[in-house]
């Protein structure tokens, strides 16, 4: 019997609030409410949207970024905490899967973190960007493979990667082997210019084709006033314009709605889940089109820990702490990520 599910998804392209602490969270909640009025069941926000992506690190040297870096620490998200509680409540209220990018603060370090909340408000996945890109390495620490999981939500199997993680084919394959149905990708947007938008489009359409899944991609947006607040240099301001490609793509690599390349807005489309089988019938890259006896992937999915107590084996230590590290604590209700 064919898959009868049709899931309405939304990808959001809006600007953060640089001025008011908590302002970006208000924008997240308002967008969730708006999406609910459109019948949306899954919504994706841009990379590290709360409180904002560290654009300053792209156009300023580290020696001139200390105050802005400290401000980001002060507004960063503790998981679990007030931000996750607010988003959890909104997800539960509207029975919506919410995929949110945050700057996570874990004691003295910041991380580029993706959070997935299920339709009952439970946080079902917390993962950290494996390797921050270029300028980002001055801002965030590194994630590990413990978060390379697909979450089984109330509507579909959901996976997520951030920005140039999509250029790591092994990271993408790790999610593909768990049979993700909806891939949620996040990019900063308002960066590099039109060439970045073109690269994003190629990337997300290729992943949709290769994995045989839907891709819901969200990029951020900066207003002219916000760009001018980051840098007064006209040449550097050019580096903070363009680069937006908020879009929803089918398993056949087709846009399901007109993508958003500039300005604020929301791309909404219906995902006919039967298209997954239609694609994989022809090419299942982790099934009948795979050759695991020739090519296979090894993953060290143990959480990276600075201390392993001698009172327990390394394997035992990894098993004991993995759920907390993946989902970010016990305050939010949890579901088990998909194992395979």
Curated annotation (Swiss-Prot):
Active site: 47 (proton acceptor), 129, 163 (nucleophile)
Domain named CN hydrolase: residues: 7-273
EC nos: 3.5.5.1
Alphabetical UniProt keywords: Hydrolase
Transmembrane segments: none
Reactions mediated catalytically: a nitrile + 2 H2O = a carboxylate + NH4(+); phenylpropanonitrile + 2 H2O = 3-phenylpropanoate + NH4(+); an aliphatic nitrile + 2 H2O = a carboxylate + NH4(+)
Pfam families found in the cross-reference section: CN_hydrolase
Activity control summary: Highly resistant to various miscible cosolvents and tolerates high substrate concentrations.
Thermal dependence summary for this entry: Optimum temperature is 40-50 degrees Celsius. Displays high thermostability with 90% of remaining activity after 2 days at 30 degrees Celsius and a half-life of 18 hours at 60 degrees Celsius.
Record has Nucleotide-binding as a keyword: no
Applications: Nitphym exhibits high stability at 30-50 degrees Celsius and broad substrate spectrum, and emerges as a promising candidate for industrial hydrolysis of nitriles. Immobilization of Nitphym in a packed-bed reactor enables the biotransformation of 3-cyanopyridine into nicotinic acid (also known as niacin or vitamin B3) in a continuous mode.
Highest taxon above the source species: Bacteria
pH dependence: Optimum pH is 6.0-8.0. Activities drop at pH values below 5.5 and above 9.0.
GO molecular function: nitrilase activity
Signal peptide extent: none
Family (UniProt): Belongs to the carbon-nitrogen hydrolase superfamily. Nitrilase family.
Quaternary structure and partners: Forms oligomers.
Function: Catalyzes the hydrolysis of a broad range of nitriles to yield their corresponding carboxylic acid and ammonia. In vitro, shows high activity toward benzylic/unsaturated nitriles. The preferred substrate is trans-cinnamonitrile, followed by mono/di-cyanopyridines and aromatic substituted nitriles, with a moderate activity toward 3-phenylpropionitrile. Shows weaker activity toward the common dinitrile fumaronitrile. Also shows weak activity toward some aliphatic nitriles, including adiponitrile and glutaronitrile, and the arylacetonitrile 2-thiopheneacetonitrile.
Protein name: Nitrilase
Lineage of source species: Bacteria, Pseudomonadati, Pseudomonadota, Betaproteobacteria, Burkholderiales
